[in-house]
Amino acid sequence: MIQTFSSTIRRKEMDAVLTCMVDEKTGPGELNTRFIQALKEFTGCDGAVAFRSPSIALSYALKAIDLPAGTAVMLSALAPFWQYDAVEKLGYKPLVLDVEEQTGLVNAQTVQQGISEGGRLLILHESMGILPEIEEIVALGIPVIEDISHSIGAVLPEKSDEAFDGTEKKQGKKQNRRAGSFGIFSILGLEEFDTITGGGGAVLLAPQRRDWIVLKKYTDAASRTDILPDINSVLALVQLKEFNRNEQARKNLFAVFQRALMSGKNRTFVRQPDEGSTIWSFPVVLNGSVKDVKQYASRKEIEIQPAYSDSVISRLQDEQSKDLKISKALFLRTVLFPLYPRLGSETAAKIAKVLGTLP
């Protein structure tokens, strides 16, 4: 059976973790520091801290923002449930937003609606590696915390502007901005099936110096039990170094699978090409019976899984989700097919054939 997920742990990752164990330096230390430095260079952020869980990372972000208790925090209905759970436990009120059908993401219109209902901060989950209308959302003027667990490495071209130097007009250069650089803070999950895994944990990043200065006051006083151990950090470090190689492999597979899917009646989400998005699994929005598709794939020895089985909407009562019609439909109809760098060409061809002949 071809499994839906693989963490793509190769010999390099195994050797790095084994060396960490042999050196008996498994707690937070030098390797955590090296991982953070590499991540800062990769993302261009001003500062970052690696924690033992995404929930802990979020708690420090909200401390730094100084969000009053009871404030409504906006979340996507298709975001991972840990966000909803953490927001409640930290003393805030989750305000769940619907998504747009083509991308599975919240857009500026739904966020504006959330603001009108009292939302004062947005946790923006960039699901499936797709970037939303992020500039339009940030322009609404509320604090945004990006979740780049799927979208790390995605790049949004920035419009070039004309600039003045005091005497003459100059044409500004077009610059690209990476996922994670738009919000006040961003969270990079390192959980088992995140794009970069450390076997658990998360990194809280501050893109701008002014925000890092504030955040650092809190993280400098963090308990050692909040900080990511070296044994996790070294795994994440090697994964980060291998990111470009792995991402190119994922993109090549995605292109093959997407072409195959186009011959049938089902679809995947709309995304920007090339660096405008990154690849996390292969989501398929089914036009027919999920049960029939699952049985068909299983007969071909391919495991598929519901895309949003651990999402916010998966835990809400019917009364709570009655206005989340698009999210509900995508929750029920979207499945994930295997897509990861270790798939061989023969296996990839087998998956592509199934995608092109789905019921």
Residue ranges and their predicted role:
Residues A61-G114, Y296-A297:
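Conserved PLP-anchoring active-site segment centered on the Schiff-base-forming lysine
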